[in-house]
Amino acid sequence: MKVKGSLKSHRNRDKNCKVVKRGGRIYIINEIKPRCKTRQGS
């Protein structure tokens, strides 16, 4: 999983990317391409 300061560019990488909030963190998940997984923050 990648950790980024901003998810704006990662959100638009693939049409199957979804933005999800879990436990106060923001994640981008993609069930078709798991390598697109990203988390915001340190």
Swiss-Prot record:
<dbReference type="InterPro" id="IPR035977">
    <property type="entry name" value="Ribosomal_bL36_sp"/>
</dbReference>
<protein>
    <recommendedName>
        <fullName>Large ribosomal subunit protein bL36</fullName>
    </recommendedName>
</protein>
<keyword id="KW-0689">Ribosomal protein</keyword>
<dbReference type="InterPro" id="IPR047621">
    <property type="entry name" value="Ribosomal_L36_bact"/>
</dbReference>
<dbReference type="Pfam" id="PF00444">
    <property type="entry name" value="Ribosomal_L36"/>
</dbReference>
<dbReference type="GO" id="GO:0003735">
    <property type="term" value="F:structural constituent of ribosome"/>
</dbReference>
<dbReference type="InterPro" id="IPR000473">
    <property type="entry name" value="Ribosomal_bL36"/>
</dbReference>
<comment type="similarity">
    <text>Belongs to the bacterial ribosomal protein bL36 family.</text>
</comment>
<keyword id="KW-0687">Ribonucleoprotein</keyword>
<dbReference type="GO" id="GO:0006412">
    <property type="term" value="P:translation"/>
</dbReference>
<dbReference type="GO" id="GO:1990904">
    <property type="term" value="C:ribonucleoprotein complex"/>
</dbReference>
<dbReference type="GO" id="GO:0005840">
    <property type="term" value="C:ribosome"/>
</dbReference>
